[in-house]
């Protein structure tokens, strides 16, 4: 070696102790290695990391032998393992009486001596990355120019960056983002030296460096000075930031003494063998690197760097994605990104001595890089943060040959959610469109490699199967050389659908692609496979049947997963969720069928079950899950006078409705109980799955046999000894058994001393007071109304469910299941089927008893039928309404009058929450001559009778919630008590009636006109006259009523001028349908202005005396 080279070697190696071959006293820096597949000899320097094809001159070389073992390091288990190139064996324990070649250290050194792609990417004739393809010979001829030897012996320093410089930067451009770049230029403009400051994950004394795992570049491609090491270049100084240390990853590549530059990623091909000596260096290699802010992908013409070890010939599987070491801490504000560089489709990988290089990833593979069951720990897909103690040992080598068939897909970065614990998939500024594949940025497909079974340490894979591995997903950062022994210490997993017939089922490799669950946005990726495969067959010569089989198996796996998890992914794009899209609900196959077991209507929305069943395995970013979970509890919206036990379900249900509206095609109002879309229950999921995870294990009989889930979900005349749902609350455990007895009493299945209304009152009071009992109560009601062959008991069970829903909803966890159960009974056709079937069973039982000569029981007249559909429709409406309002507000517990009213409301609808036309129909018998709703006029008169126009803060100060509830109960019975004293009570109830109208007082189709003409009195009045007659009459009566309060004499006392009245009354007349807070905020001001204009300018004299 030259003196400069020798100085470079000795001043930049990582370890202070130079390596020695075990069993020898002579220091040997060069070793001979025979590549296992091509049987070609290679020579590596264990000190500098230099690799050459030809034997170096003037040095001793350790020849290869049968007893030569290569020492490698597995980062997953932090253990060394040993590979024999002669026998292709891999063992854990260090072999005895043999030569150990510490290639782990060599690999670490090579990782520290590589730099991003230099300006040679600008070579003429190079096809651009935006879709152009060339022949298989073109890249080889171009690379002949690229690998011309550099006789001047120029050295190259490593640039370690946090940003993927090759996948997003144009040729000759170093993307300056998230790191600092230091450059030295010579007088003629050539780049003499550049490097970056070390990046740290943690502050403090313990420095953790970033080893670039996913994108290694040939270090010799970076132009440097003329024959000098980086630190000793004349005319350029090695600049460093103050306080930074020369970290081990800033190493220098030294070419061979004869000037021949070895391409470590090159494999001999039919077109190119070795680089010939040349007296001149290619001008492409010395172009100065120009800073630029533009971002475009780098050239794909360089051959990629192959794995050191791959899977055994018997089988193979997609990689397992491993997380960084357990002791590495990450800062919360660090961006994590995935790169997607490319490589030449015309080059076969060199089979040996590579450092990891980011492989092309299609959109089908972007979301694959998440760690299973560790969403909080899947981080960088491009870098592996490791401490100094790992840098000197770890070997990061790619799992298998990267696919030259798939172009680089769009780049994405996984950014931590400020909420904590979740990660969001965000488009990178470097997003590009792959024109050749026609893949749009944002079209993703999710794939998952199967977990391997325990097996031996890794062994090489033949080239034929390496090509076939190109369809598999690529390995994450912390994966070692192929499949290291640590990656096999995973639990067993079901064999993949796409397992190739030639693979063995005894070892650790899985299918060709492994299990690849897909999201709903997968069609663009699937469509792009055909052209990709055709191109691959053209340039690589991969057998067509093998790729066709792989593609078919992959699509079969997609279809299998889609069918299996169809109900678990609430897709917004293709509508494959459970929205009915106008479909008529399917009738039940019969009442005997366990309806509750089939009623999974919205089971996939249960967040815990959904995450646990599918995407926990994938480690999906939580932000992706949040859109598909309809019931969440992260918002709370308690209201004044709210009972302490009601705040949680209020916010959760409000969030549920908000999420449900986001999925609907026509978003309903956020402050109204809209006409809810009926939904089909999912046939793929079953509540028994949920029950098996949440139910207690019940036993029966002397031998304590376990009760099946199906029997636990069917009607029972026996009592229960423990709650249906697993709970740790002692109060719930005690009350659950008592509630079940009370339910049996109310339904007539158990003798009761108290009146049924008082039994229902006790049940409703317990559920209203203790939120933990609500799910238990509803699951018991569902059980007792399933396979119940007594018509009276069945009717009472549904009646009790309606009573309970009038006071409190279930918790969000059980909301979807109850909704699905109710939905299944909303078809009126089933009422006749249930009644007929029950009568047939009764007749059959009576015949059996007559044959056995048993004394028949006294005949009890059964009702002709049960209107289950009527109960179900009412319960469905109350359930959706409770999702917005939550449980009954106030401090007073339910009373008998409220129970009676809730019982009668099933067949006698309330005036609150109904449409104007329905309210007029209700009062037609009592008040046939009235043109206005009785409730509106009666409450308005009551406000004035109590001197509301002389009461300060009228319509602004709320009335006592308990008194408002009591008055509402009376009004629903067409009564108004005479003992009222506070005008705020009827005023609050009047506002409640306006607010709870099924359709707003000013219909939605007129909303935009109102917002547009909020400043024009003429246009505003014209909008009022265009309303339907009943709406116009009610609105004009309201305006005339409010005009009383804006009189100057009244305003002086009430402190409620026209602006204040418009502010408090506008939300009761106009309802914004947008969910955008900015739109709501802006429209609120316009709504108030519109109502103020009406109060000031609308002529309501024609309403004099109208009732």
UniProtKB/Swiss-Prot annotation:
Residue stretches making up the WW domain: 25-58, 63-97
SMART domains, sorted: MyTH4, RhoGAP, WW
Primary location recorded for the protein, binned into one broad class: nucleus
Residue ranges of domain MyTH4 in the record: 715-867
Comp. bias intervals (Polar residues): 111-122, 242-254, 331-343, 353-369, 470-484
This protein's GO CC annotations: cytoskeleton; nucleus
Residues with site note (Arginine finger): 956
Sites of N-acetylserine modification: 2
Biased composition (Basic and acidic residues): 7-19
PANTHER family given in the database record: FI04035P (PTHR45876), RHO GTPASE-ACTIVATING PROTEIN 39 (PTHR45876:SF1)
Name under which the protein is recorded: Rho GTPase-activating protein 39
High-level lineage: Eukaryota, Metazoa, Chordata, Craniata, Vertebrata
Gene (UniProt): Arhgap39
């Amino acid at each position: 070696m030259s003196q400069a080279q020798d100085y470079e070697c000795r001043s930049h190696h990582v370890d202070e102790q130079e390596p020695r071959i075990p069993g020898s006293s002579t220091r040997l820096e060069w070793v001979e290695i025979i590549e296992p597949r091509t049987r070609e000899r290679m020579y590596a320097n264990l000190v500098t990391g230099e690799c050459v094809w030809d034997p170096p001159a003037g040095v001793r070389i350790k020849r290869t032998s049968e007893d030569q073992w290569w020492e490698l390091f597995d980062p997953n288990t932090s253990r060394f393992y040993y590979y024999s190139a002669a026998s292709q064996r891999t063992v854990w324990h260090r072999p005895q009486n043999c030569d150990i070649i510490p290639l782990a250290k060599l690999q670490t050194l090579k990782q520290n001596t590589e730099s991003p792609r230099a300006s040679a990417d600008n070579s003429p004739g190079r096809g651009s990355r935006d879709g152009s393809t060339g022949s298989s010979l073109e890249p080889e001829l171009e690379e002949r120019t690229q690998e011309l030897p550099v006789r001047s012996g120029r050295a190259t320093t490593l640039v370690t960056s946090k940003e993927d410089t090759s996948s997003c930067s144009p040729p000759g451009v170093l993307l300056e983002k998230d790191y600092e770049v230091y450059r030295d230029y010579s007088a003629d403009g050539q780049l003499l030296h550049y490097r970056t400051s070390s990046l740290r994950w943690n502050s403090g004394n313990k420095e953790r460096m970033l080893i670039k795992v996913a994108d290694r570049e040939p270090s010799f491609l970076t132009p440097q000075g003329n024959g000098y090491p980086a630190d000793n270049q004349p005319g350029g100084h090695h600049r460093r930031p103050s306080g930074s240390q020369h970290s081990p990853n800033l190493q220098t590549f030294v070419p061979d003494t004869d000037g021949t530059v070895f391409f470590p990623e090159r494999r001999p091909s039919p077109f190119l063998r070795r680089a010939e000596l040349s007296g001149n260096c290619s001008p492409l290699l010395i172009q100065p690197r120009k800073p630029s802010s533009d971002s475009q992908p780098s050239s794909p013409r360089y051959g990629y760097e192959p794995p050191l070890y791959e899977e055994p010939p018997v089988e193979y599987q997609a990689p397992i994605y491993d997380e960084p070491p357990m002791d590495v801490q990450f800062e919360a504000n660090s961006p994590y990104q995935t790169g997607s560089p490319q490589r030449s489709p015309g080059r076969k990988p060199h089979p040996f001595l590579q450092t990891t290089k980011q492989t092309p990833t299609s959109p089908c593979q972007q979301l694959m890089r998440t760690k299973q069951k560790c969403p909080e720990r899947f981080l960088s897909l491009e870098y592996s943060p490791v401490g100094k103690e790992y840098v000197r040992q770890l070997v990061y080598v790619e799992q298998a040959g990267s696919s030259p068939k798939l172009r680089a897909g769009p780049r994405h970065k996984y950014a931590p959610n400020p909420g904590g614990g979740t990660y969001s998939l965000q488009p990178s500024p470097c997003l590009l469109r792959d024109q050749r594949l026609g893949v749009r940025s944002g079209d993703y497909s999710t794939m998952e490699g199967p977990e391997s079974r325990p097996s031996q340490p890794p062994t090489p894979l033949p080239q034929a199967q390496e090509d076939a591995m190109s369809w598999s997903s690529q390995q994450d950062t912390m994966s070692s050389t192929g499949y290291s022994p640590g990656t096999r210490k995973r639990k067993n997993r079901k064999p993949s659908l796409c397992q190739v017939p030639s693979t063995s089922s005894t070892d650790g490799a899985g299918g060709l692609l492994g299990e690849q669950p897909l999201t709903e946005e997968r069609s663009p990726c699937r469509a792009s496979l055909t052209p990709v495969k055709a191109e691959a067959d053209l340039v690589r010569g991969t057998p067509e049947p093998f790729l066709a089989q792989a593609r078919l198996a992959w699509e079969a796996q997609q279809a299998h997963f889609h069918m299996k998890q169809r109900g678990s992914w609430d897709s917004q794009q293709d509508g494959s969720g459970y929205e009915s899209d106008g479909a008529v609900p399917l009738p039940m196959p019969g009442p005997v069928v366990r309806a509750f077991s089939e009623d999974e209507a919205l089971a996939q929305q249960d967040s815990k079950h959904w995450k646990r069943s599918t995407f926990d395995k994938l480690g999906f970013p939580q932000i992706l899950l949040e859109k598909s979970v309809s019931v969440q509890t992260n918002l709370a919206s308690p209201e004044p006078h709210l009972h302490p036990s009601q705040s949680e379900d209020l916010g959760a249900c409000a969030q549920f409705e908000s999420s449900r509206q986001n999925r609907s095609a026509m978003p309903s109002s956020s402050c109204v109980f809209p006409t809810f879309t009926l939904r089909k229950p999912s046939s793929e999921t079953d509540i028994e799955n949920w029950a098996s995870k949440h139910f207690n294990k019940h036993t029966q009989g002397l031998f304590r046999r376990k009760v099946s889930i199906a029997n636990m979900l069917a009607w029972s005349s026996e009592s229960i000894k423990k709650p249906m749902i697993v709970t740790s609350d002692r109060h719930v455990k005690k009350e659950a058994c008592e509630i079940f007895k009370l339910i049996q009493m109310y339904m007539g299945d158990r003798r009761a001393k108290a009146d049924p209304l008082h039994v229902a009152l006790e049940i409703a009071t317990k559920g209203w007071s203790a939120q933990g009992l609500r799910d238990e109560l509803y699951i018991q009601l569902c059980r007792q109304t399933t396979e119940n062959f007594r018509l009276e008991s069945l009717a009472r069970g549904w009646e009790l469910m309606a009573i309970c829903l009038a006071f409190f909803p279930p918790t969000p966890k059980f909301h979807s299941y109850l909704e699905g159960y109710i939905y299944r009974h909303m078809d009126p056709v089933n009422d006749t089927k249930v009644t007929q079937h029950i009568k047939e069973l009764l007749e059959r039982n009576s015949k059996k008893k007559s044959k056995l000569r048993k004394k028949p029981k006294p005949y009890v007249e059964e009702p002709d039928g049960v209107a289950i559909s009527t109960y179900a429709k009412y319960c469905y409406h109350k359930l959706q309404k409770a999702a917005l309002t939550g449980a009954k507000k106030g401090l007073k517990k339910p009373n008998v009058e409220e129970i009676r009213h809730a019982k009668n409301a099933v067949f006698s609808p309330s005036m609150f929450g109904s449409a104007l036309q329905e309210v007029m129909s209700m009062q037609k018998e009592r008040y046939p001559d009235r043109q206005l709703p009785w409730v509106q006029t009666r409450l308005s008169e009551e406000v004035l009778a109590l001197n509301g126009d002389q009461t300060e803060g009228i319509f602004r100060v709320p009335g006592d919630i308990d008194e408002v509830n009591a008055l509402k109960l009376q009004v629903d019975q067409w009564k108004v008590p005479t003992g009222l004293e506070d005008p705020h009570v009827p005023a609050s109830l009047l506002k409640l009636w306006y607010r709870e109208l099924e359709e707003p007082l000013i219909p939605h189709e007129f909303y935009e006109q109102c917002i547009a003409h909020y400043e024009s009195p003429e246009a505003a009045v014209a909008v009022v006259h265009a309303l339907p007659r009943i709406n116009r009459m009610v609105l004009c009566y309201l305006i005339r009523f409010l005009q009383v309060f804006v009189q100057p004499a009244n305003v002086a006392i009430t402190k409620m001028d026209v602006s204040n009245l418009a502010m408090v009354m506008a939300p009761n007349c106009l309802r914004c349908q947008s969910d955008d807070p900015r739109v709501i905020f802006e429209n609120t001001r316009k709504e108030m202005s519109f109502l103020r204009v009406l109060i000031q300018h609308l002529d309501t004299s024609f309403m004099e005396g109208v009732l």
